[in-house]
């Protein structure tokens, strides 16, 4: 009897390898690509890029500025006819996002040819929290399959995205990985399920290493006292992004999609352009 993808994934999983945002429903409304990203001529088709993820991708309101998720910047890299429906929510894992019923509205809205970008890991690592924690090669992969299966059953195309790295350096100033076995477990699942994977973990680790401890301060949410009214005492956050950081991580995602010819050749724009921070905006609420 032929071995199914699910059986193959289960066998692979057995190998010993290595925060809620207010106004989430409003934030998940599709955001069209900006006019500056529109190319000439008639688009091949219109579609939506859905995002399921955590705070590193999630939309923020004005009260959280200048913090920004990479999903807020993704529309600038999409061509005419493509929109972003950012359902990512602060503090969620692959498990809690699903168990809270947040995957269901995505699957109700998604259409054939749309993309579902799935990026979890930061909160799956919190294994002391039964509502969020998962094991890399068992429950993490099991929950991720629910996103893959749901999208594929509706003719949409799921894409796994490894979790973006935090800002952590060793004594020699080299960027260090922080996600344990979760990125490798996602890579293994993508191979077993034959779905595209954008390796943002590897791309971001290399970029943070290139920028170094000083350069990454412009990526992450490090603010001096008095720099922003929402954080009068300043802030030092090595997980979440300033607008520039959100743009650069969105660029990593967009480049990975283009390499995989998703959603189709020519759908991605401005991948090598200087993009101003002003493309990121925060709705009131």
Segments from the language model and where they lie:
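N-terminal secretory signal peptides and thylakoid transit peptides that target proteins
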Residues: 1-15
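C-terminal region of N-terminal signal peptides and the immediate post-cleavage residues
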Residues: 19-38
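Serine-esterase "nucleophile elbow" of acetyl-processing enzymes
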Residues: 34-88, 104-112, 116
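Glycine/Thr-rich phosphate-binding loops of Rossmann-like dinucleotide-binding domains
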Residues: 59, 94-95, 126, 169
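Structural motif
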Residues: 93-101
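Alpha-helical cap/lid subdomain in secreted, periplasmic
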Residues: 102-247, 251-266, 283
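Short, flexible loop/turn segments with low-complexity composition
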Residues: 262-276
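Short, low-complexity, Pro/Ser/Thr/Gly-rich segments in the mature regions of secreted, periplasmic
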Residues: 277-284
């Amino acid at each position: 009897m032929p071995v199914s993808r699910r059986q193959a994934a289960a066998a692979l999983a057995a190998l010993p390898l290595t925060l809620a945002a207010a106004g989430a429903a409003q934030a998940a409304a599709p955001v069209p690509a900006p006019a500056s990203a529109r190319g000439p001529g008639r688009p091949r088709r219109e579609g939506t890029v859905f995002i399921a993820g955590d705070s590193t991708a999630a939309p923020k309101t004005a009260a959280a500025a200048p913090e920004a998720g990479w999903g807020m910047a993704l529309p600038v890299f999409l061509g005419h006819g493509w929109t972003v429906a950012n359902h990512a929510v602060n503090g969620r894992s692959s498990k809690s996002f699903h168990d809270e019923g947040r995957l269901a509205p995505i699957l109700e809205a998604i259409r054939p040819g749309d993309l579902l970008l799935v990026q979890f890991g930061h909160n799956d690592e919190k294994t002391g929290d039964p509502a969020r924690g998962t094991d890399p090669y068992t429950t993490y992969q099991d929950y991720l399959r629910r996103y893959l299966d749901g999208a594929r059953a509706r003719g949409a195309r799921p894409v796994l995205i490894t979790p973006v790295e935090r800002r952590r350096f060793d004594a020699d100033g080299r960027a260090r990985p922080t996600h344990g076995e979760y990125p490798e477990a996602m890579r293994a699942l993508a191979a077993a399920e034959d779905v595209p994977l954008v390796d943002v973990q590897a791309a971001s680790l290399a970029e943070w290493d290139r920028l170094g401890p000083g350069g990454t301060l412009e990526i992450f949410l490090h603010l001096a006292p008095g720099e922003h009214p929402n954080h009068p005492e300043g802030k030092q956050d090595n997980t979440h992004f300033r607008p520039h950081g959100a743009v650069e991580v969105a660029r990593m995602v967009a480049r990975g999609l283009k390499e995989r010819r998703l959603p189709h050749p020519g759908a991605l724009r401005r991948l090598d352009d200087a993009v101003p921070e002003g493309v990121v905006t925060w709705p009131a609420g």
